[in-house]
Design a protein with these regions (language model features):
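Short tryptophan-centered beta-strand motifs in secreted/extracellular beta-sheet-rich domains
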Residues: 73, 436-438, 494-504, 508-512, ...
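Accessory carbohydrate-binding/adhesion or oligomerization-edge regions at the termini
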Residues: 192-249, 260-264, 308-340, 588-591
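Secretory/extracellular carbohydrate-interaction modules
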Residues: 421-471, 476, 563-626
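Aromatic, loop-rich ligand-recognition surfaces of beta-strand-rich domains
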Residues: 634-700, 706-748
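Aromatic-lined ligand-binding clefts that engage carbohydrates, nucleic acids, or primary amines
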Residues: 228, 263-288, 319, 323, ...
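Surface loop/turn signatures of beta-propeller and other carbohydrate-active proteins
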Residues: 1-20, 38, 56-77, 104-134, ...
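Short, aromatic/His-centered strand-loop micro-motif at the edge of beta-sheets
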Residues: 476-498, 622-636, 748-753
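Short, solvent-exposed beta-strand-to-loop segments that form ligand-recognition rims
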Residues: 291-299, 513-534, 767-785
Length: 808
């Protein structure tokens, strides 16, 4: 930094964090937070500098004062070119604000509060924090991803949320998603798998412990520990209020500690995963067999191998622990029954999000920081999907996470580095649907070839310096048409500008500098629908430069409806591709779906949602005969968070994205505000109703009791079609929350997201982000299609693209 207001203080370059950067019209703009809390002064401000070169040097245009308060700047450019800055202020905890900008260095309006974190939600598990905003626009919707809770692993609650709005400054508490989109994977582990050390027939959290060294046989089941004290694990010398990772169960201030915990296991007990957090040297024994030993500090999960699991026996078992004080003082342990699964690493505290396009131009990727086990923070990346317009993240994942989590897809063709004009692409597959983009540096008379079949059938998108305009020039059958549109007054020549086109049949969409081209963006009938071609670049001056050309076969955001027994085929014949869509308007009587693989009428794979069987039915046909058929049940357990628009301490309201058929509810038996209070029948505290057709109806339970996971009560009922569920406290004087998240067994619903990935002879299938299977297929290059049998299904948010080969 080089400015007047930090000079002579302790606020130096080592206090810079939370950078944001963007390129506009030849300049790189860098924004950062100064986060200095010193005895000489406090300097907690947002700063701006700019440079002609990405690597600097950067100069602050205003050295006298800072740009704004306080931290986490993010600049977003809307489709009309208007700039907005989002930042965090310390007004109600850490609060997110937005502000219109005059230019990259100046503001044009007053700050507008977007939101703070809400009490009694996942956002306030510890501290009042909403920070790290990242704003993007896609499919005509605005998305803000943000962090909530304290960033430190000492709490372990840092998570990522999303708000979705219809204007850049329209984010508010009511349009937040009710749930975190990326959180700690231990939450799901604890909800799905039973911790044998805490749950038997009921909640049994107490361990026997002593602070005096016991006799030599203390690790054996037969040892008499009746003289030992009893306490809940989470042994610590201090309380970290709201912490998940270092929850205080019992105070511990001596150098060493010995623990014993008996638990039951049966023939149904499966694989075991030991989760342990300790600050000093620790040994853990299972029925006298050493299963864990480590010096110093750690926080990890250990999947016990076959040899170590052999120590487990039917009936009563004993876990014994010796642990010691480290630099700090904490110990906690869990033992999960994984059934036939394997536990992942501990992945937690995702934060500081950046959402960027992937290398192929179609995908979106989330880049963020997170922690694995007790390691230092690292960089993580996960795919961002859109279920039509709902943002979904395939994460949090790490190196050992089960399932299909590929690297970012490569384009069909990628040109690296700076080059002169290379004309139209050679030796690439022509197509009627593709994306092409590149950087263009010109004084005029250059641009991209949007479509090339031959000299009489082609299209050009060019920059015209003489007329300060851009143009689309097409030739179809030798007949020429040219349309020109004015460029912004401040458009600079001789610097790089980004051009992007998407062709889908006859439609051509054009972007300039990553926003819709000024004047006109969509040309619905610019090209012949069925005439395949390739893109490229052109330079009439022989002095232009191009950088980073990308060509990917595919299309984005097709919206259409089928009716009756109808089929629609699309796409090129490829061996590697991804294909997804949101399917709506499903009834309980019809079938609708797609051809994730279609070679011809006698060779294909069909995947259909069947409302009668409530299955995804997948059929492979070869040479006109059924080769195999698989059925994947669509019924599943969903976790719902209360919708703040319909929730307070008296009534808890939950909404479904689409009407769904339900037959079972699950409630956590721990009181929402006090986990140590364990309730025998949580359902007894509420009147429960479901919403259908705008009217509320009571749920009449058939059976209720303790679920397979003892932390939950269940309630079964005759299946109902519901748009929402609400829980109303039965007693008028009862003003407690009691519950937060609920479990819902969903049988069927009116809308699903479907995704298929073909990688040569393997086909991966997903529904609503859940991987159903990886199927072996053997077909030549194929395209995709859509199909219905009765009904009028609607397909929206359709995305299809080639997965190119990596070329290093």
């Amino acid at each position: 930094m080089d400015n007047d207001w930090t000079r002579g203080s302790g606020a130096g370059n080592d206090q810079i964090h939370a950078n944001d950067m963007f390129y506009l019209n030849g300049d790189f703009h860098l924004y950062w937070s100064v986060n200095y809390w010193g005895k000489d002064k406090h300097a907690v401000h947002i700063v701006h500098a700019q440079s002609k070169d990405a690597l600097g040097a950067y100069t602050e245009p205003n050295k006298k004062t800072w740009m704004d308060n306080r931290i986490d700047p993010k600049v977003f450019r809307d489709d009309d070119g208007q700039l907005y800055m989002y930042m965090v202020r310390f007004t109600d905890g850490n609060t997110i604000w937005g502000r219109k900008m005059k230019n990259p260095a100046e503001f044009a309006g007053e700050p507008v509060c977007q939101f703070a974190s809400l009490p009694d939600t996942w956002e306030t598990m510890d501290n009042r924090v909403a920070e790290g905003p990242w704003v993007m626009k896609y499919r005509d919707r605005y998305y803000m991803m943000y962090n909530a809770n304290h960033t430190s692993t000492e709490w372990g609650n840092y998570q990522l949320g999303v708000a979705e709005a219809d204007s850049p400054l329209g984010f508010q508490n009511g349009n937040k998603y009710s749930y975190p989109v990326v959180g700690c994977n231990q939450t799901q582990l604890e909800e799905k798998q039973v911790d044998l050390l805490r749950y038997g027939r009921t909640y049994e959290p107490l361990f026997a412990y002593t602070e005096s060294k016991p006799g030599s046989d203390w690790t054996k089941v037969t040892y008499d520990d009746s003289g030992w004290a009893r306490g809940e694990t989470g042994f610590s010398s201090r309380e970290v209020k709201g912490s998940t990772t270092r929850h205080l169960g019992t105070l511990w201030n001596t150098p060493s500690l010995w623990l014993r915990k008996t638990f039951s296991a049966g023939s149904e007990t499966g694989n075991l995963a030991l989760r342990v957090a300790h600050d000093g040297d620790t040994r853990i024994y299972l029925n006298g067999t050493l299963v864990y030993e480590k010096q110093g500090r750690d926080y990890c999960i250990v999947n016990l191998d076959k040899k170590l699991r052999a120590a487990l026996k039917e009936g009563t078992n004993l876990l014994a622990v010796e642990t010691n004080k480290g630099r700090s003082q904490f110990f906690d342990v869990s033992l999960f029954d994984m059934k036939d699964g394997i536990a992942d690493d501990i992945l937690m505290t995702p934060g500081q999000p950046n959402i960027l396009r992937g290398p192929n131009g179609f995908e979106w990727w989330l880049i963020y920081m997170a922690n694995k086990n007790d390691e230092h923070r690292g960089q993580y990346i996960n795919r961002v999907q859109f279920f039509d317009k709902t943002l979904f993240v395939d994460g949090i994942t790490g190196p050992r996470t089960a399932g299909y989590h590929p690297e970012p897809s490569m384009p069909t063709f990628a040109g690296k580095g700076e080059t002169a004009s290379f004309g139209v692409l050679q030796q690439v597959q022509p197509s009627v649907a593709y994306l092409f983009e590149t950087g263009v540096k010109t004084e005029g008379g250059a641009g991209i070839v949007a479509w090339w079949k031959d000299a009489d059938n082609c299209a050009y998108v060019g920059l015209d310096a003489e007329n300060r305009s851009w143009y689309l020039r097409t030739l179809v059958g030798g007949k020429e048409n040219k349309e020109s549109y004015a460029l912004p007054e401040d458009f600079r020549w001789g610097v790089y500008h980004h051009l992007r086109i998407e062709r889908n049949g006859g439609c051509l969409k054009i972007w300039l500098d990553e926003i819709p081209a000024p004047g006109r963006h969509v040309f619905a009938e610019a090209l012949p629908v069925e005439e395949a071609g390739v893109p490229g670049v052109f330079d009439e001056t022989k002095s232009a430069l191009f950088e980073g050309a990308t060509y990917t076969i595919g299309f984005d955001d097709v919206h259409f409806q089928l009716s009756g027994n109808e089929e629609l085929l699309k796409g090129d014949f490829l061996n590697d591709y991804e294909f997804s869509f949101q399917l709506s308007g499903l009834s309980g009587q019809d079938k609708a779906g797609s051809y994730p693989v279609y070679v011809d009428k006698d060779n294909y794979v069909k995947a259909q949602f069947d409302g009668i069987t409530r299955m995804l039915e997948v059929t492979a046909v070869k040479k006109g005969k059924t080769a195999w058929k698989k059925e994947f049940p669509l019924g599943c357990l969903q976790t719902l968070y209360p919708d703040v628009k319909y929730t307070d301490f008296i009534e808890k309201g939950y909404r479904f994205a689409a009407p769904a058929w339900l037959d079972t509810l699950y409630l956590n038996r721990h009181e929402a505000g006090n986990k140590s209070e364990f309730v025998d029948d949580m359902f007894g505290k509420f009147d429960i109703e479901y919403l259908n057709g705008g009217e509320w109806h009571p749920i009449e339970n058939k059976d209720r009791g303790i679920a397979e996971h003892p932390a939950y009560n269940y309630c079964t009922f005759t299946p109902v079609k519901a748009e929402g569920i609400r829980f109303i406290n039965k007693e008028a004087e009862d003003l407690e929350r009691h519950i937060y998240k609920i479990g819902v067994h969903e049988l069927w619903k009116e809308s699903y997201n479907f995704r298929a990935v073909r990688r040569a002879d393997k086909l991966y299938l997903f529904v609503d982000g859940r991987e159903l299977g990886a199927l072996d297929i053997r077909y030549p290059a194929s395209r995709i299609g859509f199909c219905s049998e009765g009904g009028s299904p609607v397909y929206s948010g359709t995305l299809y693209y080639h997965v190119g080969q990596r070329r290093d």
